[in-house]
Amino acid sequence: MAPARHRRTGLALPQRARAQSRMKPESWAAPTRAVVPDKDPFYTPRPGFESLAEGTILRSRPVELAAFGLIGLKVRAWQLLYRTTDLNGMPEATVTTVVAPLGGVAPGAPLLSFQCAIDAISPRAFPSYALQRGSRAIGTFAHVELLCFADALTRGWAISIPDHEGMLGAWGAPREPGYRALDGIRAALSFEPGGLDPSAQVGLWGYSGGGLATAWAAEMAPSYAPELDIAGAVLGSPVGDLVSTFHRLNGSLHAGLPMLVVAGLRRVYPAFEELVATHFSDEGRAVLDKAARSTTAAAVMRLARYNVDRHSGTPIAELLAMEAMLAVFADLTLGDRAPTVPLLVVQGVHDQIIAVEDIDALVQRYRDRGAHVTYLRDRGSEHISLLPLSTPLSLNWLADRFAGVAVTPSHTRTVRSVLALPAGSRGLGSLVRSAFRVLFGRPITASATGHGSERTGREARHAA
C-alpha cells in the first residue's frame, strides 16, 4: 500500500534558527581522494541531527571537481551535508555540491539549483561523487550536464547540485527529491563561505530524471519551503506518466531505465518489493540487483531490448494494472499540486524516451490548477540532444526571471528547434566557450555581463 501523503508541519523560521545553533556544523578538510558515498564517513550524520530544522548544515568541506573525474574544474566548490526529509516525513541527511565562479559571487547573485539526471541507484551516480576529481563514475550523465550548467557560472551565479535521490538512491520516488533540493537550497544560502545573500533569488532547473526532481521541488515549495524566493523553474523533458513510460520502454533499446526505476522504488514501496518477490523469477530479481549496482549507461546497454515478461510469470500489463500498483503510481504522478512559480517546460516532439503526449497532459494538469506554464515543443530534437540545445534558452529564461522581466501569458508553442528562437540562439556562443573552459581546465569566472537579463523589451515579448 502506498504511504500516505506527507503534510509538512515543520518548524517556523525563528525555531529553525534556534535549532541550528544548538549543533554547530563541522568543517572537514578537503578529501584526498574520491570515496563512494556509502563508504565515505562524511555522509554519515552525527546522532541528534534529527531534531534540527530542515536545511541545517551538519558539516562542510571544500572539494575539487573535475570533468569525467580527470580534468580539474577551476572553480570554488564545497560539499554540504544537511538535514532533510524523506518520502514519509522522516528526517535524513544528504549532500549538495555548491559551486561558485573562481572569483566568487557578487552581491545580489542568484542561486541555481540544478537537479542532475541521476537516473540510477548506485551511489557512484550521485553527483557529489561523480563530479569529484578522481571519481570512477563512467556511465553517469552528470559529466555531460556539467558542460551545460557550467555556463551559469559565467553569468556570476552560484549552483547547488543536490543528491536528490538521497542515500537510498530511490529513483522515481515522489516528493522527497523536491524536499532534498529545497533543503539543499536552504543549506547553500546559509553557507557563509559561499558568499550568497540568505535571501537570494533562486532558480530551479533539471532535465529528464533531473526534470522530474525539479518538478517535485516546484510542486512542494509552496508548502515545504515558502520562505525561499524562487523566481522560476525549468522542467526539461520530465517524466509525466510513469505507467506510460514503463509500457513505452519495456522491450526497447532503453528498457534498462524502467528496470532502474523498479530497483529504486522497491526500496521505498512495500508494494513494489512484494511484486518483485511474488512475480519475478530468481533470474529477474538478479537482473534488478545488478541494475541497482550499475551506472545509468551501463544498465541501459546491458538491458537493451529486455522484456520484463521474460522473468515474470505475469505479463507487465497485468502487473501494472494490479490495485496495489495503481495506488503506487497514483502517488508517483506529478501534477496534483500547482507550482506557484512560473514554469518553462521544454519537450521534444519525437523524444524516444519520454512521450510528448505525457508532457502535454502534465502541462494541462498544471494549468488546470492555476500554474503559469510556458511550454515549448521541439520538433527537431530527440531526448539526449535537447538538453544542450535548450541550455541557452533555459538560462536566458531564468535570467529574465531574476531580472524581473514579466512572463508572457501561459502558452504552448511547437517549434522546429528551440535554437530558432531569439532566446534559444542567444547565449550559444557562451555555452560553447564555457564548455571549452571545462574541457581544457581553464578558469571559470563571471563574465562582465553579470547575472541580469540582457534582453530588450521587444526580445522579452517575442523570445518564447
Question: Predicted segments — roles?
Answer:
Residues 2-105:
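Catalytic-loop region of hydrolases
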Residues 86-95, 99-151, 163-165:
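Short, surface-exposed "cap/lid" segments of acyl-processing enzymes
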Residues 108-111, 155-160, 199-201, 229-232, ...:
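Loop/turn elements at helix/coil->beta-strand transitions in domains of secreted/extracellular proteins
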Residues 142-148, 171-194, 216:
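Alpha/beta-hydrolase active-site loop
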Residues 186-257:
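Primarily recognizes the serine-hydrolase "nucleophile elbow" in alpha/beta-hydrolase
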Residues 239-335:
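Accessory cap/linker subdomain of secreted extracellular hydrolases
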Residues 322-331, 344, 353, 360-464:
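C-terminal catalytic histidine-bearing segment of alpha/beta-hydrolase fold enzymes
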Residues 339, 344-351:
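Short beta-strand/loop motif that positions the catalytic acidic residue
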